[in-house]
């Protein structure tokens, strides 16, 4: 290895004879001394920033070096370190059985093969397997499209149709008399492991409707009746491909048919807000990519409720956009201004960050002046023209959204100059408010520019009216009958199901549009809806088996926009109190924000361009929640996945990751050793396929493997290569069980307090463990269980103890302090985990075969340490010094500066820099430790309050009263206006309910917001085995000695506590937010990262019926109810004047 933890940690061999070391202590101008073990490894050149000469110049002192050495004798400290290290090494090798395990693998070296991994061949194989899997999902969706269009073709609309169906909300509901409610018949539900253990019905689908859609509307009843034909196809698809998950049909009228059928639970207010037409998969499948400029009227006539509705309309439009769309928003009154000045003259990608940024700015819009529409229209047309000519943006649909309370003219000269006769830019008009005086001109603008006109009178009107523009944009695709297949970005559909198991699963959806094939409606381009199916990304990534990628290797996926679809370092959740919540931008994390060492973005560019190839990078890999770092050289292999917008990457680390170990043994011998009770397999790895046959789903991987090997189940499919490696490892590691058992039987009562457990893991995911204490006495019960993901083999990673040991010289141990986290485990004793790697060498190639270790109580380690430091080199008489003396402070720290042992228990587990900043600062200047800056582009920070000044004037009682009164009146106004048109919304059914989108209310701001942070990690330089120094602390000088503890990643640090060095601030390992000034922030926001556009575009069709362009809504309402809100708004300015 040229980099990695092997460079962080000491070699296990005794120190070789070194040439005479320069005695810096002989020079009174110097007060520190260092003893190099050997020349620094080349790979550490970028870490070792401070030379010995530099710290030598920094450490001038008048203190006599002889006094410092006498204060803390180097020989004594070395004796303590060697004694403690020797005792520790003997204990961990004895109880882990690491020497025996190494011998067992050594004995079979002659039968082993170590092959070099061909990364390109590997990534191509994984890609083909993923392509085949995804193709089956596409075929299932195509079957649904054909069935839905055929059913519609054979269905005649019946205005008076009466039809009962399974309503997802009402199924199994009973009234007071015990009878099933209407649309709520008995519906059998059974828990199903394949569907996250949710109660489902795999025989039939159920139908969900949002609260604001009447469940007996003739359009709904006819659509539900027609789509009953999908039930048979749902079941047939699932039988043909049992790996399918949810299949569904989202109708353009608003109902959502989902298979398998489920019970849908309203929210705490009894409201169903889920509307399939708002989902990304529906919108992407229904339309092609688009460039949109929103023009919003902010003249004085838009004050009050009109502005509130306009803001909500903009927010709703923004919610219909995705990563393939581009957007800008212009506000106009007497003059034209961009609501984000940084975006002047351009369009920006409608990713989540930009959409949310626009929403915040929209809320701050103020009204004044007179509206000048023609200037705004000219500005919008010019932006769209410039982007089209520069080959930027979506290069597909272009549209202008005009949001106003009216237009005083038709602006024909503007359209004649910029848009006629081709009408390449569609214009959609939204008339805000109940006034209809300007309706004709607003409709004329839309109808003469291939757009659509709607009138929005209330907040509750917004959703349905905004959605009309999507149906217009879908017309060319519908007329052409082009069934484009779309794949979404990664998402957690917590709105689909209120189940935690579902909401925390990252999915991608494949979807296709469903069209009306009836000849009489061909020119209208009627979209019936969208069908789709979910693919759990975990299932997709199982096709890149973990065991083929080495200890540090991994596979990842990204999209055509450069966003991560799946990556081990993608952290989509954050903790808020006791709850885990999705980060706001979890599905728009760019590849360059995870693989941030790729400064030139060469990897990102190649993958977006669908290239097949390889490149190498030196990387710093954070571990253990960012407290530690590995230095690796990674080889990246990448290719595309055909017929999808995705690209696949595979990472192999240089050194161990380049090779794969292949062993062989007989099935009979291996089977015998598989049956040992101490053996387990990686729970997330796929040894055998158990999710196809329902009879296999209850089997563990170990049970399935045994049935496969004994031929009890000929239908079982298993990974024969992986099974062979498991059998081999089972045979080689079998003697460990007898070894550990013998140790446990021979343990005395005193030795029972030494080690809690021993364990080992192999590169095939095999785990063995043995307890040396009763299970009730185990200190860390989560260790080696799924509750502690870092300690077990997962789909993404090898265990932390395995990864650390593999980068440490084989035979020496890595010690990690562990303590149970969370309030439920408060007070549990701390434990220490020690692990070592077992390496095998064949034909000069070395591979890591396994890692073994022990877990012990910290208390045992402390006892060993204090006993070791009572020894001294004096032959006769008692020792003159001990670490227990009041004039000495002794610490045992690890190679990242964390304290394992201290006199003060409160310091255990803390970073040395927090406890003694002076000494750590000196160690950094001496080069004993180096500081590495790491970056986190997925962090969450407390938002800064930049909207309001912190120095607010005192609020008078009258001002407070008026503010409260204004708020109450606003709420009353909005409430009455929404409810005043109850009858006109749903005059077809009194059972209809409304759902209101209160975007005008201030949303509760999350306490944390996405941000970029940087944080330091401190790394010991193993070339320096021992060093001493003096810190100038004003009136006194602090002496310290640091000594490497052999065969470990530990250091003994002895300091003089009598000198107060509080003038040195603590050195913290805390993350700090990276702040960007306005200019840099604007440049970052304006930058257009490389992306690949979707392959298809449907912008226009000559047969399109452009005269179907909307009409005025029926806005009749109760005059008395309308009068009060209008008066209230009129009174507000006077009341608050």
From Swiss-Prot:
Disulphide bonds in the chain: 447-1097
Pfam families for the chain: VGCC_alpha2, VWA_3, VWA_N
Cytoplasmic side: 1137
Subcellular location: Membrane
Extracellular-facing ranges: 20-1115
A GO-annotated cellular component: voltage-gated calcium channel complex
Cache domain sequence ranges: 487-580
Coiled coil: none
Residues that bind a divalent metal cation: 297, 299, 301
Chain positions of motif MIDAS-like motif: 297-301
Transmembrane segments: 1116-1136
MF terms in GO: metal ion binding; voltage-gated calcium channel activity
InterPro entries referenced in this protein's UniProt entry, alphabetically: Ca_channel_alpha-2/delta, VDCC_a2/dsu, VWA_N, VWF_A, vWFA_dom_sf
Tissue specificity: Predominantly expressed in certain types of endocrine cells. Present in the Paneth cells of the small intestine. Also present in the erythroblasts in the fetal liver, in the cells of the zona reticularis of the adrenal gland and in the basophils of the pituitary. Present at low level in some brain regions such as the cerebellum (at protein level).
Superkingdom field: Eukaryota
Description of post-translational modifications: May be proteolytically processed into subunits alpha-2-4 and delta-4 that are disulfide-linked. It is however unclear whether such cleavage really takes place in vivo and has a functional role.
Keyword field contains Glycoprotein: yes
Stored SMART domains: VWA (SM00327)
Subunit: Dimer formed of alpha-2-2 and delta-2 chains; disulfide-linked. Voltage-dependent calcium channels are multisubunit complexes, consisting of alpha-1 (CACNA1), alpha-2 (CACNA2D), beta (CACNB) and delta (CACNA2D) subunits in a 1:1:1:1 ratio. Interacts with CACNA1C and CACNB3.
Protein family according to the UniProt entry: Belongs to the calcium channel subunit alpha-2/delta family.
Function according to Swiss-Prot or TrEMBL: The alpha-2/delta subunit of voltage-dependent calcium channels regulates calcium current density and activation/inactivation kinetics of the calcium channel.
Miscellaneous section: In contrast to CACNA2D1 and CACNA2D2, it does not bind gabapentin, an antiepileptic drug.
Protein name (record): Voltage-dependent calcium channel subunit alpha-2/delta-4
Lineage start: Eukaryota, Metazoa, Chordata, Craniata, Vertebrata
Gene name linked to the record: CACNA2D4
């Amino acid at each position: 290895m040229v980099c990695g933890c092997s460079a962080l940690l000491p070699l296990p061999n005794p120190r070789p004879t070194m040439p005479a070391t320069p005695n810096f202590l002989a020079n009174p101008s110097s007060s520190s001394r260092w003893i190099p073990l050997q020349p620094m490894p080349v790979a550490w050149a970028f870490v070792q920033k401070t030379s010995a000469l530099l710290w030598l110049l920094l450490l001038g002192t008048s203190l006599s070096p002889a006094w410092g050495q006498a204060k803390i004798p180097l020989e004594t400290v070395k004796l303590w370190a060697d004694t403690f290290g020797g005792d520790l090494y003997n204990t961990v090798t004895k109880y882990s059985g690491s020497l025996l395990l190494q011998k067992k693998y050594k004995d079979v070296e002659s039968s082993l093969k170590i092959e070099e991994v061909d990364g390109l061949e590997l990534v191509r194989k994984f890609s083909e397997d993923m392509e085949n899997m995804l193709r089956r999902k596409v075929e299932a969706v195509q079957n649904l499209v054909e069935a839905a269009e055929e059913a519609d073709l054979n269905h005649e609309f019946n205005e008076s149709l009466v039809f009962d169906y399974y309503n997802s909300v009402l199924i199994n509901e009973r009234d007071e008399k015990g009878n099933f409610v209407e649309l709520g018949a008995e519906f059998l539900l059974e828990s199903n492991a394949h569907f996250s253990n949710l109660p489902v019905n795999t025989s039939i689908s159920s139908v969900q409707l949002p609260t604001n859609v009447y469940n007996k509307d003739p359009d709904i009843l006819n659509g539900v009746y027609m789509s009953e034909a999908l039930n048979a196809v749902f079941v047939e698809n699932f039988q043909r491909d049992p790996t399918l998950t949810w299949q569904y049909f989202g109708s353009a009228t608003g109902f959502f048919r989902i298979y398998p059928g489920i019970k849908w639970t309203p929210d705490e207010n009894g409201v169903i807000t889920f509307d399939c037409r708002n989902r990304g998969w529906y919108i992407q499948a229904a339309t092609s990519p688009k460039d949109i400029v929103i023009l919003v009227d902010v003249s004085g006539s838009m004050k009050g409720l009109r502005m509130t509705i306009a803001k909500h309309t903009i927010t709703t439009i923004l919610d219909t956009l995705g990563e393939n769309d581009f957007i800008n928003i212009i506000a106009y009154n007497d003059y034209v201004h961009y609501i984000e000045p940084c975006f002047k003259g351009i369009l920006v990608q409608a990713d989540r960050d930009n959409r949310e940024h626009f929403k915040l700015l929209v809320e701050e819009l103020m009204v004044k002046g007179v509206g000048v529409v023609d200037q705004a229209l000219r500005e919008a047309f010019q932006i769209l023209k410039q982007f089209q000519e520069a080959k930027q943006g979506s290069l597909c649909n272009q549209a202008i959204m005009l949001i106003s309370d009216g237009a005083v003219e038709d602006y024909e000269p503007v359209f004649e100059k910029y848009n006629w006769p081709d009408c390449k830019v569609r214009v959609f008009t939204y008339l805000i408010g109940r006034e209809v005086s300007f309706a004709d001109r607003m409709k004329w603008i839309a109808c003469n520019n291939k757009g659509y006109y709607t009138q929005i009178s209330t907040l509750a009107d917004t959703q349905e009216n905004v959605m009309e523009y999507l149906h217009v944009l879908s017309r060319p695709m519908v007329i052409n009958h082009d069934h484009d297949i779309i794949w979404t970005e990664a998402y957690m559909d917590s709105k689909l199901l209120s189940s935690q198991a579902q909401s925390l699963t990252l999915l991608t959806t494949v979807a296709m549009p469903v069209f009306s094939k009836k000849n009489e409606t061909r020119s209208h381009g009627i979209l019936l809806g969208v069908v789709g199916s979910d693919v759990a990304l975990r299932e997709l990534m199982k096709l890149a088996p973990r065991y083929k990628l080495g200890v540090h290797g991994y596979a990842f996926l990204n999209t055509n926009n450069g966003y991560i679809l799946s990556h081990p370092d993608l952290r989509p959740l954050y903790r808020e109190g006791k709850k885990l919540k999705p980060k706001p931008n979890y599905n728009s994390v760019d590849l360059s924000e995870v693989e941030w060492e790729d400064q030139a973005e060469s990897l990102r560019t190649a993958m977006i361009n669908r290239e097949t190839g390889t490149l190498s990078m030196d990387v710093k890999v954070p571990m253990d929640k960012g407290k530690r770092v590995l230095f690796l050289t990674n080889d990246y292999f990448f290719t595309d996945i055909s017929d999808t917008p995705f690209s696949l990457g595979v990472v192999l680390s240089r050194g161990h990751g380049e090779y794969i170990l292949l062993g062989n043994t007989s099935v009979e011998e291996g089977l015998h050793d598989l049956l040992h009770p101490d053996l387990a397999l990686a729970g997330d790895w796929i040894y055998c396929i158990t999710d196809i046959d329902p009879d296999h789903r209850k089997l563990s991987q170990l049970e399935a493997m045994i049935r496969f090997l004994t031929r009890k189940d000929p239908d079982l499919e298993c990974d024969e290569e992986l099974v062979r490696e498991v059998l081999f490892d089972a045979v080689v590691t079998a003697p460990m069980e007898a070894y550990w058992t013998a140790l446990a039987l021979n343990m005395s009562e005193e030795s029972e307090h030494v080690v809690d457990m021993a364990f080992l893991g192999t590169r095939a995911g095999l785990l063995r463990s043995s307890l040396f204490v009763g299970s009730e006495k185990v200190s860390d019960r989560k260790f080696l269980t799924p509750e502690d993901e870092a300690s077990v083999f997962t789909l993404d990673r090898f265990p932390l103890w395995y990864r650390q040991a593999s980068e440490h010289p084989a035979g020496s141990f890595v010690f990690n302090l562990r303590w149970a986290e969370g309030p439920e485990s408060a007070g549990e004793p701390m434990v220490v985990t020690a692990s070592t790697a077992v390496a095998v060498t064949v034909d000069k190639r070395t591979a890591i075969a396994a890692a073994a270790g022990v877990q012990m109580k910290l208390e045992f380690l402390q006892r060993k340490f204090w006993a070791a430091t009572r020894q001294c080199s004096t032959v006769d008489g008692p020792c003159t010094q001990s670490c227990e003396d009041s004039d000495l402070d002794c610490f045992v720290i690890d190679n990242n500066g964390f304290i394992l042992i201290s006199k003060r228990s409160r310091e255990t587990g803390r970073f040395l820099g927090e406890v003694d900043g002076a000494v750590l600062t000196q160690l950094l200047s001496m080069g004993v430790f180096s500081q590495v800056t790491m970056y986190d582009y997925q962090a969450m920070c407390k938002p800064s309050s930049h909207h309001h000044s912190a120095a607010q004037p005192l609020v008078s009682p009258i001002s407070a009263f008026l503010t409260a009164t204004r708020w109450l009146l606003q709420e009353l106004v909005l409430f009455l206006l929404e409810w005043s048109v109850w009858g006109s919304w749903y005059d077809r059914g009194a059972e209809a309910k409304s759902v209101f989108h209160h975007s005008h209310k201030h949303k509760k701001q999350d306490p944390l917001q996405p941000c970029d942070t940087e944080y330091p990690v401190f790394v010991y330089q193993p070339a320096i085995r021992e060093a001493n120094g003096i810190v100038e602390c004003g009136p006194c000088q602090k002496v310290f000695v640091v000594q490497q503890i052999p065969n470990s990643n530990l250091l003994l640090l002895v300091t003089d506590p009598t000198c107060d060095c509080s003038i040195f601030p603590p050195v913290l390992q805390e993350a700090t937010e990276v702040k960007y000034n306005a200019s840099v922030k604007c440049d970052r926001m304006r930058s257009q990262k490389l992306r690949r556009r979707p392959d298809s575009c449907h912008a226009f069709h000559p047969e399109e019926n452009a005269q179907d362009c909307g009409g005025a809504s029926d806005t009749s309402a109760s005059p008395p109810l309308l009068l009060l809100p209008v008066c209230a708004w009129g009174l507000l300015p006077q009341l608050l004047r």
